[in-house]
């Protein structure tokens, strides 16, 4: 059994990001992978003339579900029960874990096989199973790499995106033999050989396991059908070979009808992997005679989702279909990777989803996440369900600041108080601008930049130059020249820098 590593105790984003930025190999791995995926996405999206209409349709379908979630959940429970499945309701991670562990124990198993699932990562199911003496074997290739390497996932879609091929080879050679079939000592780092080694290692686990655990990409309300979208075939093995199947699914994963599902099956593969369609789409509806699991359990997970639903601004995050398109275009994620976010949900979507599921104002790590963004809006431009991530980030920043009001003011609150005082009167602002212009003369160097400032401003100049303030502020120039109409030098002198344009 491999001990599962968790994000518990991770430092705030700025601290973790600084460490990640110093790792040039990590940055290279992330950059190469994200650029490849986003280039493929752009190509296949351009093939659809109605892609924007599909995005709007998907957003509308999700909003319809969220506005009537109680009704749809009742429909789901009825459909699943009629199909022979057992439905369980879990308010939080602890309750969901207890349900899964009890089912596994009732079948007297000491291991389960798993399909890649963000929901089970969110609730740290592997940790709960291990505590009960039950090994949880990840069967997704990237998840297997993370598990064997005693590592943490760093991407929603490609958890081992921070690893290159040579690193994967070393992990396989070192770790596979400890928990199952060993890798060939002559294993190379060619993708086909690495995949073959993983296939041989996992095959015996598939054939041996009596219980499988999965998540679901979608849950069709009208029939109670669960849908798993994947690329490797491991999901199909987990959903057909074991005798018992336990599916943990977030309550927001519902789509009303099969017609609605069609919209998402066009959007998800294009946004996630840059493919026109995904290689494997597995659907199952309860228990069927003969083939497949003869006992199906579905755990409907809340774990903070109803709290998010109550937030008029933040509830749009529940539209998320876990495609990871936002991560592949995010300049912050590209430079820091996923571990710096301290959550199974990294990147732009993680920066809003994690604080809303956990709650703000509870710990420094969670409170730092909404600030892990440049607010450039690239995430919103590619989101297949039109989540306005920048808007939600600003909304959450406001909540974080409000949660820390009172008591001894921190650096941010002190800075904002000072800014409020300065901007509260035109004379105070003019005096500050004049002082800034004089400081530019003292601190600036040739070329109009400042290379060194005292703390805490040194945090900027330690990494990059700061443009020197102009000798004459724009407000003074505007007043002196009547908006530029009375400035005979305006064609030659820049009002922003006070320097000759030539």
Ranges and model annotations:
Residues 68, 99, 140, 164, ...:
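Secondary-structure junction/capping motif
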Residues 1-313:
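The feature marks the mature, well-folded catalytic cores of soluble enzymes
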Residues 6-37, 415-502:
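Intrinsic disorder at enzyme termini
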Residues 75, 79, 83, 99-103, ...:
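Generic, well-ordered alpha-helical scaffold segments in large soluble proteins
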Residues 291-317, 332-451:
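Ferredoxin-type iron-sulfur electron-transfer modules in oxidoreductases and energy-metabolism complexes
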Residues 256-258, 272-277, 328, 335, ...:
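Acidic/polar loop patches that form or flank catalytic/metal-binding clefts of enzymes
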Residues 70, 90, 94, 196, ...:
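Conserved structured core elements
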Residues 150-153, 177-188, 360-366, 404-408, ...:
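Intrinsically disordered, low-complexity coil segments
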């Amino acid at each position: 059994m491999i001990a599962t590593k968790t994000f518990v105790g991770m430092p705030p984003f700025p601290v973790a990001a600084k460490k990640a930025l110093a790792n040039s190999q990590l940055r290279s791995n992330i950059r190469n992978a994200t650029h490849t995926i986003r280039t493929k996405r752009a190509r296949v999206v351009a093939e659809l003339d109605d892609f924007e209409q599909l995005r709007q349709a998907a957003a509308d379908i999700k909003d319809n579900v969220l506005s009537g979630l109680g009704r749809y959940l009742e429909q789901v429970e009825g459909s699943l029960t009629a199909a022979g499945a057992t439905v369980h309701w879990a308010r939080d991670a602890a309750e969901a874990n207890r349900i899964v562990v009890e089912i596994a124990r009732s079948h007297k198993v000491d291991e389960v096989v798993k399909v890649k699932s963000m929901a089970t990562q969110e609730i740290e199911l592997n940790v709960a199973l291990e505590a009960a003496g039950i090994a949880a074997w990840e069967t997704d290739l990237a998840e297997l790499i993370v598990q064997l390497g005693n590592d943490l996932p760093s991407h929603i879609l490609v958890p081992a995106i921070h690893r290159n091929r040579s690193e994967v080879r070393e992990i396989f050679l070192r770790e596979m033999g400890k928990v199952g079939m060993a890798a060939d000592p002559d294993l190379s780092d060619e993708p086909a050989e690495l995949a073959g080694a993983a296939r041989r290692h996992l095959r015996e686990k598939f054939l041996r396991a009596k219980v499988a655990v999965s998540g679901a990409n979608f849950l069709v309300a009208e029939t109670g059908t669960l849908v798993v979208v994947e690329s490797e075939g491991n999901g199909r093995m987990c959903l057909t070979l074991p005798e018992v199947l336990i599916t943990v699914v977030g309550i927001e994963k519902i789509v009303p009808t099969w017609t609605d599902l069609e919209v998402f099956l066009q959007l998800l593969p294009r946004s996630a992997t840059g493919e026109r369609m995904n290689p494997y789409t597995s659907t199952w509806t309860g228990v069927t005679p003969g083939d497949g699991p003869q006992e199906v359990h579905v755990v409907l997970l809340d774990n903070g989702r109803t709290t998010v639903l109550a937030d008029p601004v933040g509830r749009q995050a529940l539209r998320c279909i876990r495609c990871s398109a936002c991560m592949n275009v995010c300049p912050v994620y590209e430079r820091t990777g996923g571990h710096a976010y301290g959550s199974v949900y990294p990147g732009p979507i993680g920066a809003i989803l994690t604080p809303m599921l956990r709650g703000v104002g509870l710990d420094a790590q969670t409170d730092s996440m909404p600030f892990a963004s440049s607010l450039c809006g690239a995430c919103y431009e590619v989101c297949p369900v039109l989540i306005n991530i920048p808007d939600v980030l600003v909304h959450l920043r406001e909540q974080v600041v409000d949660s820390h009001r009172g008591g001894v003011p921190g650096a941010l609150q002190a800075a904002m108080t000072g800014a409020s005082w300065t901007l509260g009167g035109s004379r105070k602002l003019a005096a500050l601008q004049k002082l800034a212009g004089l400081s530019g003369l003292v601190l600036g160097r040739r070329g109009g930049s400042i290379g060194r400032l005292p703390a805490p401003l040194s945090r900027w100049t330690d990494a990059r130059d700061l443009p020197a303030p102009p000798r004459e502020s724009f407000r003074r120039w505007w007043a002196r020249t009547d908006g530029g109409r009375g400035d005979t030098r305006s064609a030659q002198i820049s009002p922003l820098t006070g320097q000759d344009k030539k």
